Amino acid sequence: MAKKNIKQKKDNRIAIDVKKHIKKVDVGVFDGTFVFTSPLSISELAPKLNKSPNEIIMRYFKKGVVYNLNTILDEEQIGELCLEYDLDFKIEKNVNTENLLENIYFDDLEIDLVARAPIVTIMGHVDHGKTTLLDTIRKSSITASEAGGITQHIGAYQIIKDNRAITFIDTPGHEAFTEMRARGANLTDIVILVVAADDGIKMQTEEAIDHAKAANVPIIVFVNKMDKYEANPEKVLNQLSAKEIVAEELGGDVVFVKGSALKNEGISELLDSILLIAELNNYKANPNRLAYGTTIEANLDKGHGPLATLLVQNGTLRKGDYLVVGSTYGKIRNMFDEYDNEIEIALPSKPVKVSGFEEVPTAGDKFLALADEKQARAIANDVKQKKMRLERAMLQSSDIRTKIANGELKNINLIIKADVQGSLEALKGIFSSINIEGVTTTLIRSAIGTISESDVRLAQTSDAIIIGFNVRASRIIKDLADSVGVQIMNYDIIYKFKEDLELWMKGTLDPIIIEEVIGEAKVLKLFKHSQVGTICGCRVINGKIKRNALVRVLRDGIVIYNSKIATLQHNKDSVNEVIADKECGLTIANFNDIKENDIIEVYIKVEKKHDEVK
């Protein structure tokens, strides 16, 4: 039987014009304005300003600052210099395929735009009920939680209220996830700030407020745990008012909803408030475009390979689309909604799980659907090349490398493998939060997936510790690591890793030398001896003094000499130590200018680890 010709439906979605987005900025003075893109060295800047390098160097020299041709001036310095030359200045950005995804813009006509679901981010302090609230909204009994009691991974979900969709982004609640929360706020239209009525605002509450303000988005405050006996909503209102989050009932413009996520109280009112704000702000997108959006989460899935949760921000995503996501690309093989139902299309504001990537994407990366695979691959490769250049530049940082080589700076090499991108990002964020003078950490490799032979071999050659977060090494890999002396550390709680890293960093430093005073003696009488010099007749006034111990000679409370005890006698017998309230005779090495009533302070030097020093 002859096969019927099945007519493929034409794809009318508009593709991004990549060439139109590419922009090369001409650096120079135009109509009294100096246009530039980034920090410049004096040798690069001078001709662009129509000045000689020596003139600029002399200008700084007169201010008491010594610069040379290779000195890099930052954007602020260049701006100040322009003003000194009576020039306006303007900072523009070169756009090429390496940074294209961060610089996508849309020139859609109003007629092409349609209403989309509001994107809502739930934020708040740990244990104030964010996850419970989200689970109650979804009418789900499943709460994904970390071993340490922290929501493990960012998730995105869509629910329906009165036939209208609302998309929620859930962000972890602990301080280690500050960057992840910040990224969530940048994606969002509305922030729900969860504050426990029995606890009030806390550190993460204030951080969330800062992120919401920075993103310039409306805030709805959900005063949770109103079912608690200790609930004090007035306290919460007053605390937030002090942070310029003023409730409508106090004359402000912020919606406050009081309720209990645990008992499903106030939830309907909260959703109504979201829909009202969405209606007032008229959120729109153009579904007739190839999709553009942001990676919420990514991991290596056993069944599907590299898997990413994507949030469509504009356009429509379809199964079979070619995507570039940061430094990787692929063709959508499978697409699932938040309930793991396989779907064919995703409209604006829809979160979906997508498989088909060459590598695991990075959470926070922008994605773009393109008309063909060749273009997607080319852009991804350019982004990857830029990433590799930056990594090489970091490794070749002469300042750090020189200090390490000279022993001025201690270093710990780490290889991190994690279950999902969100965990990896949080672990990497730990590095920047720990600042211990004299020691640094170098991240040799960080990736999603199990610990491999390649990781062990790299750790062996780079003298690195392997960190596995929610991933384990097989018995074969463990045996290999043991045989070559590579240490593998496993964690499932972020802050246990932080504590250990701090201990490792302190442990690499040379011990701190602490001086401990063990005794004091007062000089009562002096005796001159032709062979040994001045002998001090002393009484030990506290502690004890020991032969060969270090001493400070104090006169009227001022140290006049540092030396050590050369000889020590008690009742004409040579002894090793003399205790308090006993008299003794002693000599001080290389010092004879001692006087009666001088105090001899005896001390020892003790090595202590950095974590032992308060």
UniProtKB/Swiss-Prot annotation:
<dbReference type="InterPro" id="IPR053905">
    <property type="entry name" value="EF-G-like_DII"/>
</dbReference>
<dbReference type="InterPro" id="IPR044145">
    <property type="entry name" value="IF2_II"/>
</dbReference>
<dbReference type="Pfam" id="PF11987">
    <property type="entry name" value="IF-2"/>
</dbReference>
<dbReference type="GO" id="GO:0005829">
    <property type="term" value="C:cytosol"/>
</dbReference>
<dbReference type="GO" id="GO:0005525">
    <property type="term" value="F:GTP binding"/>
</dbReference>
<feature type="region of interest" description="G2">
    <location>
        <begin position="149"/>
        <end position="153"/>
    </location>
</feature>
<dbReference type="InterPro" id="IPR023115">
    <property type="entry name" value="TIF_IF2_dom3"/>
</dbReference>
<feature type="region of interest" description="G4">
    <location>
        <begin position="224"/>
        <end position="227"/>
    </location>
</feature>
<feature type="binding site">
    <location>
        <begin position="170"/>
        <end position="174"/>
    </location>
    <ligand>
        <name>GTP</name>
    </ligand>
</feature>
<feature type="region of interest" description="G5">
    <location>
        <begin position="260"/>
        <end position="262"/>
    </location>
</feature>
<comment type="similarity">
    <text>Belongs to the TRAFAC class translation factor GTPase superfamily. Classic translation factor GTPase family. IF-2 subfamily.</text>
</comment>
<keyword id="KW-0396">Initiation factor</keyword>
<keyword id="KW-0547">Nucleotide-binding</keyword>
<feature type="region of interest" description="G3">
    <location>
        <begin position="170"/>
        <end position="173"/>
    </location>
</feature>
<keyword id="KW-0963">Cytoplasm</keyword>
<keyword id="KW-0342">GTP-binding</keyword>
<dbReference type="Pfam" id="PF00009">
    <property type="entry name" value="GTP_EFTU"/>
</dbReference>
<keyword id="KW-0648">Protein biosynthesis</keyword>
<dbReference type="InterPro" id="IPR005225">
    <property type="entry name" value="Small_GTP-bd"/>
</dbReference>
<feature type="binding site">
    <location>
        <begin position="124"/>
        <end position="131"/>
    </location>
    <ligand>
        <name>GTP</name>
    </ligand>
</feature>
<dbReference type="InterPro" id="IPR006847">
    <property type="entry name" value="IF2_N"/>
</dbReference>
<dbReference type="Pfam" id="PF04760">
    <property type="entry name" value="IF2_N"/>
</dbReference>
<comment type="function">
    <text>One of the essential components for the initiation of protein synthesis. Protects formylmethionyl-tRNA from spontaneous hydrolysis and promotes its binding to the 30S ribosomal subunits. Also involved in the hydrolysis of GTP during the formation of the 70S ribosomal complex.</text>
</comment>
<dbReference type="InterPro" id="IPR000178">
    <property type="entry name" value="TF_IF2_bacterial-like"/>
</dbReference>
<dbReference type="InterPro" id="IPR027417">
    <property type="entry name" value="P-loop_NTPase"/>
</dbReference>
<dbReference type="InterPro" id="IPR015760">
    <property type="entry name" value="TIF_IF2"/>
</dbReference>
<dbReference type="GO" id="GO:0003743">
    <property type="term" value="F:translation initiation factor activity"/>
</dbReference>
<feature type="binding site">
    <location>
        <begin position="224"/>
        <end position="227"/>
    </location>
    <ligand>
        <name>GTP</name>
    </ligand>
</feature>
<dbReference type="GO" id="GO:0003924">
    <property type="term" value="F:GTPase activity"/>
</dbReference>
<dbReference type="InterPro" id="IPR036925">
    <property type="entry name" value="TIF_IF2_dom3_sf"/>
</dbReference>
<feature type="domain" description="tr-type G">
    <location>
        <begin position="115"/>
        <end position="283"/>
    </location>
</feature>
<dbReference type="Pfam" id="PF22042">
    <property type="entry name" value="EF-G_D2"/>
</dbReference>
<dbReference type="InterPro" id="IPR000795">
    <property type="entry name" value="T_Tr_GTP-bd_dom"/>
</dbReference>
<dbReference type="InterPro" id="IPR009000">
    <property type="entry name" value="Transl_B-barrel_sf"/>
</dbReference>
<feature type="region of interest" description="G1">
    <location>
        <begin position="124"/>
        <end position="131"/>
    </location>
</feature>
<protein>
    <recommendedName>
        <fullName>Translation initiation factor IF-2</fullName>
    </recommendedName>
</protein>
